[in-house]
Amino acid sequence: MRDHVVAVDIGTGSARAGVFTSRGALLGKGEHPIIMNRPRENHAEHDSENIWAAVCTAVRAAVTASGVDVAVIGAIGFDATCSLVVRDTEGKPLTVSTGGEDRFDTIVWLDHRALAEADFCTATKHQVLEHSGHFMSPEMEMPKLMWLKKHLPQSWAKAGYFFDLADFMTWKATGSLARSRCTLTAKWNYLAHRQPGWQTDFLNVIGLGDLRERGNLPEETTPVGESVGTLTAQAAEALGLDRECHVGAGMIDAYAGALGTLGGHAGDLDALEHQLALIAGTSSCIVSFSRERKRSTGMWGPYYEAVFPDAWLVEAGQSATGALLDYIVGMHAAGGEPTAALHDRIVKRIAELRAVEGDAFAERIHVLPDFHGNRSPLADPHAVGVVSGLTLDASFDGLCRLYWRTSIGVALGIRHILEKMHDYGYVPDTLHVAGGHVKNAVLMELYSDITGCKVVVPKMNEAVLLGTAIAASVSCGLYDSLGAAGAAMYPGGHERLPDKRKKTIYDRDYRRFLAMYRHRAELESME
């Protein structure tokens, strides 16, 4: 019986794979790094063939580690960052790089080369922007495509296929040109609640009237949990699987994480409205679901059926969180390469210093964490970070103080987002956290104490892989819905309640946080 699935998660720096049972048990994992090219500031590029090779290596390793026979694997699912893959009319790599190398055919999600194009889209005030928080982020695909057409016209002229990275993976696996409703709705300004979903007038206004024809983009989308086909002979051989293995519609990595963290509530939309998924690693993403469409200024969405049927999804986030802490560690005189061991050492020392100094520890340092722009709730990709309260202290303890207060700034940013969501009618009271941040005791404490929310950490910290596995299990018929699959496969979680004794302290920090935003705006407006 084919009662196992393979889940693949393609992140910024590696491809990971896991083999799951139909009850959500992870039997084996594999991981392989992927390369990134950084030819200029704000430019980041992948080689999609390198990614495919990394995926194949990771899948083979996971299957070997699991000890299962490939004949029991019913489906493989892919999630990925919202990176843009460009292929020519023959399906071969086509350069997106100013360096001209064809192998670099993928603009990475975090690439901000298209700031001007994003601003142009925002200035149109087109109705599609009502579903992206009334602004366009350079991390969306339309600005990236506009940049490509303007700055690399030779690549645009040769283009035959445009893919979100997750859709590229399902194409490589099956040969199907189907696109996921998850990817197109969230990153391509496709309106799944309308017919037609593509808004031709918007494409014409931004100079992409030929996009669908040029990129082989279909009119209809494939919902999460549906199969787009079975593996081709070539893909089956490369992955070490067989041709009867189904391939589920692709997912954006953060939304796969939301499905994995909120899976236990997936069958009850009313309960789901009180839950938030916080997928926190290099950056942080908050995902919320609701039965009714609600205001979303400063956030991405609302997107119809991006994950669950008949549900609206809204996404908020911070463009650099784990990356910001890495930066603080790397730039400080007492820091260095931001390894996991160094982060652990800093976190341990912070606990020691707090035990001695109490609530006064580093209290005069204040940080606005917008070092890579403010995704939410200000929707300002041009925003910059601010640090107040520095001295000449270059010691390791000085680094720990700055790290602590930067972590507070990150958590205050989450509170800022949640308060805006409450203003818009969202009713979350529980944060389900997944990703690298769950390994950081400082952040996990602050997320609860600063937001006032109950924090839940899944018992298995592989929420993104699990979410992809849940969707894959539906695509091969193990379950008839995402709700049924989530109820069966979600492992439960550990809860942490906020320390009410800290409320006064962090309320004051939040007032200072908002004051710093006002002061930054005042400084930047001076002539």
Show where each model-derived region lies:
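Acidic, glycine/GT-rich loop-and beta-edge segments that sit at the periphery of enzyme/chaperone cores
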Residues: 139, 323-326, 330-334, 476-527
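Gly/Ser/Thr-rich active-site cleft segment
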Residues: 10-12, 23, 78, 125-252, ...
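Glycine-rich phosphate-binding/hydrolytic loop that grips phosphoryl groups
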Residues: 119, 252, 256-261, 318-322, ...
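A short helix-loop
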Residues: 131, 149-152, 171, 175-176, ...
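ATP-dependent carbohydrate kinase catalytic cores
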Residues: 192-309, 320, 442, 447
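Phosphate/pyrophosphate-binding loops at sites that engage ATP/ADP/AMP, CoA/4′-phosphopantetheine
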Residues: 55-74, 152-156, 202-214, 237-239, ...
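Activation-segment/catalytic-loop signature of the eukaryotic protein kinase fold
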Residues: 357-459
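N-terminal glycine/serine-rich phosphate-binding loop of ATP-dependent small-molecule kinases
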Residues: 1-96, 130, 158, 233-237, ...
